[in-house]
UniProtKB/Swiss-Prot annotation:
Domain Protein kinase: residue ranges: 25-285
Binding positions for ATP per the UniProt entry: I31, Y32, Q33, G34, A35, E36, A37, H38, L39, K54
PANTHER family found in the cross-reference section: EKC_KEOPS COMPLEX SUBUNIT TP53RK, NON-SPECIFIC SERINE/THREONINE PROTEIN KINASE
Organism: Emericella nidulans (strain FGSC A4 / ATCC 38163 / CBS 112.46 / NRRL 194 / M139) (Aspergillus nidulans)
Keywords, alphabetical: Activator, ATP-binding, Chromosome, Cytoplasm, Hydrolase, Kinase, Nucleotide-binding, Nucleus, Phosphoprotein, Serine/threonine-protein kinase, Telomere, Transcription, Transcription regulation, Transferase, tRNA processing
EC number, UniProt record: 3.6.-.-, 2.7.11.1
Protein name, entry field: EKC/KEOPS complex subunit bud32
Principal place of residence: cytoplasm
Catalytic residues (positions): D178 (proton acceptor)
Catalytic reaction annotation: L-seryl-[protein] + ATP = O-phospho-L-seryl-[protein] + ADP + H(+); L-threonyl-[protein] + ATP = O-phospho-L-threonyl-[protein] + ADP + H(+)
UniProt-annotated location(s): Cytoplasm; Nucleus; Chromosome, Telomere
UniProt cross-references to PROSITE patterns, sorted A to Z: PROTEIN_KINASE_DOM, PROTEIN_KINASE_TYR
Subunit structure, interactors included: Component of the EKC/KEOPS complex composed of at least bud32, cgi121, gon7, kae1 and pcc1; the whole complex dimerizes.
Length: 285
């Protein structure tokens, strides 16, 4: 990772080898490091205000002028999408700050966002599928009654909330570009305690909470049905590949989506065309 300046009000320089240690009031915790961006948990303005710091580093293999233009365009696109969605009342991280031309002059750019507490929907569904597998095993051994209807209804409720969240995104004229269950957070309502006791580890995970979409690095502004349908198709494929036991509930996502805004019907019709093209592509290889 190339040296990257920590933006104001941050002052510590990130080393290419490792991150230096910080005091309890000035902590920078690595969360994710990808090819396009690095994500950290930090604080903003106050030690009690957690925030997410996203840095888009420069690419040394690109021409410096082209690199600065691309990095600037992408960070500004992400910031504009977040700002628009917050204004429209969509559940996304609030934008706290952005700098597309830091004074370091190294070609990097950054933005600071609200820190979203909770778990990714991916983790919740993986825990539920593991719980489901255990229940089915007990039933085969004659030790239980199998999955209760309330469990399936709980999953259906979460799927519908996901659909409504995506519908709100599309109603606002924004396309996510990378809709997966890793980019959907389930934020606890109020001050709910998300810590888990030993007795609760083998229980069905809670699915209560607000669905919050994160990571808008590939987002764009569009009201085209084709773009909306592709967004939905990416999410559908994510369920098929990552959550095989939950895939059968994906129709509930579309139910919630259909209820969320007037233009949903035409986007769902286009989804059928996108699915058809996807199947042909899979057959051809």
């Amino acid at each position: 990772m190339p040296p990257t300046n920590r933006p104001p009000p941050f002052s510590t320089i990130l080393s290419s080898a490792s991150l230096p240690s910080y005091s309890s009031t000035d902590e920078l915790t690595p969360i994710y490091q990808g090819a396009e961006a690095h994500l950290y948990k930090t604080t903003f303005l106050s030690p009690s205000q957690p925030a997410a710091l996203k840095i888009r580093p420069s690419k040394p293999y690109r021409h410096p002028i082209l690199d600065r233009r691309l990095t600037r365009a992408r960070i500004l696109q992400e910031a504009r999408c977040l700002q628009k969605l917050v204004k429209e009342g969509v559940s996304v991280p609030a934008l706290l700050g952005v700098d597309w031309e830091p004074s370091a002059g190294d070609g990097s750019s950054w933005l600071v966002m609200e820190w979203i507490e909770g778990e990714p929907v991916r983790v919740i569904l993986e825990e539920w599928e593991a719980y489901l597998k255990g229940i089915e095993r007990e039933k085969r051994l004659g030790l239980g009654e199998g999955v209760q209807g309330s469990e399936e209804e709980k999953v259906r409720g979460l799927m519908r909330r996901i659909g409504r969240a995506v519908g709100g995104l599309h109603r606002a004229g924004v396309i996510h570009g990378d809709l997966t269950t890793s980019n959907l957070m389930l934020r606890p309502l109020g001050s709910a305690d998300t810590t888990e006791t030993i007795e609760e580890r083998d229980q069905s995970p809670s699915m209560a909470g607000e669905v919050v979409m994160i990571d808008f690095g590939l987002a764009m502004q569009s009201s085209q049905d084709e773009d909306r349908a592709v967004d939905l198709y990416v999410l559908e494929r994510a369920f098929g590949s990552s959550h095989p036991r939950t895939e059968r509930f994906f129709e509930e996502v579309l139910v919630g989506y259909r209820e969320s805004y007037k233009g949903a019907v035409s986007a769902l019709k286009r989804l059928e065309d996108v699915r058809m093209r996807g199947r042909k592509r899979s057959m051809i290889g």
